[in-house]
Amino acid sequence: MLSERQREAIAVAVDRGYYEIPRQMSHEDVAAAVDCAPSTAAEHLRKAESKLLQSVVGD
């Protein structure tokens, strides 16, 4: 379902508090952790979130 990079980015985000309120890290921090550009990390997160939500909610 998720690409390896999407899975890696979302795992880091969940593990390090990206989805906590308030956030414990930014997408820039996710990018640094997975060694990619911030815009790429944001794209990985958005695509992973979309795929995961579609699997829960359906089409």
Describe the role of every protein-language-model region:
Residues 1-59:
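Acidic, polar-rich N-terminal leader regions of halophilic archaeal proteins
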